[in-house]
């Protein structure tokens, strides 16, 4: 997935609005994913999946950090997330469709917290970005 210059600007603009809320949004994204797509819980059998659990917050922080890292290296997402791609493909063996679920839930969280920022153009750019992140995280499955 190739991001245009406008896409990159839009994605960076959204993440500048997210700012210090990235960890909170990461946890909220996971909570939404676990509820909307309960099959994703199978990768977290050892987690307390209740609302506001410390484990969801901690993993949400990791998700947020990875997304921020991808934004900070938007011209080399594959390089920025290479180790994470290895982890998910070789050790965790996460079903690739789960990255699509995560991306969708992240878009919902952004829409809830920043409705004015999520214009149709920004929505499309953010969706392309999340697809690019998902593609990187599943690239080493082959």
Swiss-Prot record:
<dbReference type="Pfam" id="PF00042">
    <property type="entry name" value="Globin"/>
</dbReference>
<dbReference type="GO" id="GO:0004601">
    <property type="term" value="F:peroxidase activity"/>
</dbReference>
<dbReference type="GO" id="GO:0043177">
    <property type="term" value="F:organic acid binding"/>
</dbReference>
<comment type="subunit">
    <text>Heterotetramer of two alpha chains and two beta chains.</text>
</comment>
<dbReference type="InterPro" id="IPR012292">
    <property type="entry name" value="Globin/Proto"/>
</dbReference>
<comment type="function">
    <text>Involved in oxygen transport from the lung to the various peripheral tissues.</text>
</comment>
<dbReference type="GO" id="GO:0031720">
    <property type="term" value="F:haptoglobin binding"/>
</dbReference>
<dbReference type="GO" id="GO:0042744">
    <property type="term" value="P:hydrogen peroxide catabolic process"/>
</dbReference>
<protein>
    <recommendedName>
        <fullName>Hemoglobin subunit alpha-A</fullName>
    </recommendedName>
</protein>
<dbReference type="GO" id="GO:0031838">
    <property type="term" value="C:haptoglobin-hemoglobin complex"/>
</dbReference>
<dbReference type="InterPro" id="IPR002339">
    <property type="entry name" value="Hemoglobin_pi"/>
</dbReference>
<dbReference type="GO" id="GO:0005506">
    <property type="term" value="F:iron ion binding"/>
</dbReference>
<dbReference type="GO" id="GO:0019825">
    <property type="term" value="F:oxygen binding"/>
</dbReference>
<dbReference type="GO" id="GO:0020037">
    <property type="term" value="F:heme binding"/>
</dbReference>
<dbReference type="GO" id="GO:0005833">
    <property type="term" value="C:hemoglobin complex"/>
</dbReference>
<comment type="similarity">
    <text>Belongs to the globin family.</text>
</comment>
<keyword id="KW-0349">Heme</keyword>
<dbReference type="InterPro" id="IPR002338">
    <property type="entry name" value="Hemoglobin_a-typ"/>
</dbReference>
<dbReference type="InterPro" id="IPR009050">
    <property type="entry name" value="Globin-like_sf"/>
</dbReference>
<keyword id="KW-0479">Metal-binding</keyword>
<keyword id="KW-0408">Iron</keyword>
<dbReference type="InterPro" id="IPR000971">
    <property type="entry name" value="Globin"/>
</dbReference>
<keyword id="KW-0561">Oxygen transport</keyword>
<dbReference type="InterPro" id="IPR050056">
    <property type="entry name" value="Hemoglobin_oxygen_transport"/>
</dbReference>
<dbReference type="GO" id="GO:0005344">
    <property type="term" value="F:oxygen carrier activity"/>
</dbReference>
<keyword id="KW-0813">Transport</keyword>
<dbReference type="GO" id="GO:0072562">
    <property type="term" value="C:blood microparticle"/>
</dbReference>
<feature type="binding site" description="proximal binding residue">
    <location>
        <position position="88"/>
    </location>
    <ligand>
        <name>heme b</name>
    </ligand>
</feature>
<feature type="domain" description="Globin">
    <location>
        <begin position="2"/>
        <end position="142"/>
    </location>
</feature>
<feature type="binding site">
    <location>
        <position position="59"/>
    </location>
    <ligand>
        <name>O2</name>
    </ligand>
</feature>
């Amino acid at each position: 997935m190739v991001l245009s210059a406008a896409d990159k600007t839009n994605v960076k603009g959204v993440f500048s609005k997210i700012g210090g809320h990235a960890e909170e949004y990461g946890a909220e994204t996971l909570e939404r994913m676990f509820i909307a797509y309960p099959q994703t819980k199978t990768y977290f059998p050892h987690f307390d999946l209740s609302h506001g659990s410390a484990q969801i917050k901690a993993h949400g922080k990791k998700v947020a950090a990875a997304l921020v890292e991808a934004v900070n290296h938007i011209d080399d997402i594959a390089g920025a997330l290479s180790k994470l791609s290895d982890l998910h493909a070789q050790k965790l063996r996460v079903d690739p469709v789960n990255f699509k679920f995560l991306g969708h839930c992240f878009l919902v969280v952004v829409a809830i917290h920043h409705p004015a920022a999520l214009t149709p153009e920004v929505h499309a750019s953010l969706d392309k970005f999340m697809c690019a992140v998902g593609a990187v995280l599943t690239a080493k499955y082959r």
